[in-house]
Amino acid sequence: MNLNIEQVVAGKITPPGDPQASVAQIAANPGTNPQILRKIATESDWELRRLVAGNPNTPTDTLWQLGVDFPEAILNNPIFQLLQLEQLNLVADIPHSTLTSLLQCEGVPSNFLEYAVERQDYSLWLAVAYNPHTPGKLLENLARKSRAQDRELIRAVAAHPHAPTHLLAQIVDIGSNVAQIVAENVQTPVVVLDKILGKYGQINDPIFTTLVALHPLITPRLAIGMHLAPTESAAQSLWLAKQPATISTQLAELAATDWNILRLAIVRHLNTSKEIVEQIWEQMSAIHTEGSQMDRLIYNSFVNNAHTSAPIREQLRKLLKW
């Protein structure tokens, strides 16, 4: 039987025994002719292409083409494991753009990550750094490869949840921009946060004091001991505002404050109501300093709250120059 994409899209070609099959069913059916799958892969329909990417009967070259947009589907495709067994150095044969996408996925084989780190290829290094499951040892290797004049790689390492404590403690010395990312990493331990405060906490922009105070590991006792909160009561309020289980009525009560760090903690909370977000916006919008890091932190806190209203978002677009 001669098969073509026009017939498939028109619904005139179906798998044997299933006259009611849709094009999507054809794309997902492992018994579909590989050449038909190759043709469906050229369609603009996103879902059809995703289904072809997950089909074990899809030709290998077509899989690699689809892997740029559908890396998870490729990794979950049963044929992928077979290809690894058949080709011991499979990773070296995968097109660069496809490999870059695969490296950022949770299910990518560990030997792929190791291969990429050993290449002299900056885009592959970045892909590995952006994978949230990259182990600490590889992150250390990436940090050593990072160039001082291009800090995107070291920033990705600084934000990584698996970055080892000793590595974080080292890279905060690179500069304030890297230290800021480390301070925002929720996995950064207190000992590193304390180092950041000691090194950068005295600058005019209060960004580091604020970031450390907002960190989930900073308890009321630590907030007082590190001079991050004005009073014990304020430290307790900040701790409550950082707890995921705190309800909207409690957050509304906490909002009756003139302490900006507590206000930011409230704005960042998922349970803060639209009314409280607007109230705090009115309170804080009058105190910004054009272009400061603290301003950007404030604005991004509002951007990331789903309850921020459209009028406020319009103001934020202008302030952040979106």
Identify the role of each PLM range:
Residues 1-322:
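Alpha-helical scaffold segments
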